[in-house]
Amino acid sequence: MTNTTLDYYNNHAQEYAQTTNRADMSENYSRFLKFVKEGGSIVDIGCGGGRDLKYFKDHGYEATGLDASKELCVIASKYSGCPVTCSDFLSWEPNCKFDAFWANASLLHLTEKDIIRFFSTKTAFLNNGGIFYFSMKTGIQEGNDDNGRFFTPFSEALLQKILKTLPSCKIVDRWYSSDRLDRKDTHWESVILRV
């Protein structure tokens, strides 16, 4: 994650959490959780303000957060009541394995090379048959937005590169959706993998 991206989230953490915590993620939750065992362990990668962590915890899952923004880590932990690790995604080295990863609108802040590196190294921390959900913006250009946040767009080519690094994984669900915060020109591709 670039310094300007991290600076944005640290400097706008409260505002960002308040805005994103009101998004209706019910369809995404439903599609994801049908693949996760009841009470299973989930890591929310890029947990932001803690919206998804809180939902998972409130529905009986063992939820843990991960975020690179120190300010968002504090907010997410307080809001959700879940443990949150503050770490760069690529530096994260947990001491156990998990049933599922949830990376909603977070990996897109990495370069394509680092996204592929994340998949090739961090899926080792999923239990056998583990589930990996991720979503990324479509139809955008790679680079910084007006706020200095770096984005990598979703593409079919990127997905194929991810799959090539994980030859035994399978796509179990995939869908295209409009923005949950009603931003008119923003669309998302969501993918669920069984690793």
Question: What are the residue ranges of the model-derived segments?
Answer:
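Conserved acidic residues
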Residues: 99
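A conserved beta-strand element that flanks and buttresses the S-adenosyl-L-methionine
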Residues: 102
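Helix-to-beta-strand junctions that scaffold the AdoMet/dcAdoMet cofactor pocket
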Residues: 110-111, 126-127
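Short catalytic micro-motifs in class I SAM-dependent methyltransferases
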Residues: 105-109
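Class I (Rossmann-like) S-adenosyl-L-methionine-dependent methyltransferase catalytic domain
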Residues: 1-96, 113-117, 121, 131-195
